Amino acid sequence: MKQHRENLPIILASSSPARIELLNRIKIIPSQIIPADIDETPNLRELPAPLAIRLAYEKAIKVASQVEESAIIIAADTVAAVGRRILPKATTYEEVKNCIKMVSGRRHRVYTGLCIIKTENDQLTVKQKIVQTIVKFKKLSDEEINFYCSLDEGRGKAGGCKISGYAEAFISFISGSYSNVMGLPLFETANALTSLGFKVY
């Protein structure tokens, strides 16, 4: 899993274990993990997709401003929504429960904003992408909802759901990138890196 010597170092602007794991799947090991501490509050009437891409860009730019050496910075932000309603990154049992009730028996969308910045010779090259995945949960009983919430795996996740966990047992339909729902669309990430001269293969 060694990077090509001629590649610039990769800096991941996130401490998310899922994003680290996803990069490792395509044989990329970040040389640094620098979480970007930004205000993730949506603007008034801000829609889910614009929110995701804005936050990803703000994360990438913040980390780029802290890095002196040439590098490639990868940042992402994942937003779940039912229609135009943005679901929170649930932090409490009640928030997880409310989110799961919202998506029970219906389709919802997961957006990941991807922003990759190449900083070299005091110049920034920015690549941005918004990726959407449609996910449908079966109609859940109160018992199933309570059981899922008791697992505590949805805390800190967009929409209160960890797709790579027990929630997979509830998903009846998915259209689009699975890795996107986990937090980093790998196809788009690899393409963006390649366009910046990074040898993924």
Curated annotation (Swiss-Prot):
The keyword Cytoplasm applies. It catalyses: a ribonucleoside 5'-triphosphate + H2O = a ribonucleoside 5'-phosphate + diphosphate + H(+); a 2'-deoxyribonucleoside 5'-triphosphate + H2O = a 2'-deoxyribonucleoside 5'-phosphate + diphosphate + H(+). GO terms for cellular component: cytoplasm. It is found in: Cytoplasm. Keywords: Cytoplasm, Hydrolase, Nucleotide metabolism. The active site is at D77 (proton acceptor). One of its GO terms (biological process) is nucleotide metabolic process. Gene3D superfamilies: 3.90.950.10. Its EC number is 3.6.1.9. The keyword Transmembrane helix does not apply. Its cofactor is a divalent metal cation. It is an enzyme of class 3 (hydrolase). SUPFAM superfamilies: ITPase-like (SSF52972). GO terms for molecular function: nucleoside triphosphate diphosphatase activity. Belongs to the Maf family. Nucleoside triphosphate pyrophosphatase. May have a dual role in cell division arrest and in preventing the incorporation of modified nucleotides into cellular nucleic acids. This is Nucleoside triphosphate pyrophosphatase. It comes from Rickettsia akari (strain Hartford).
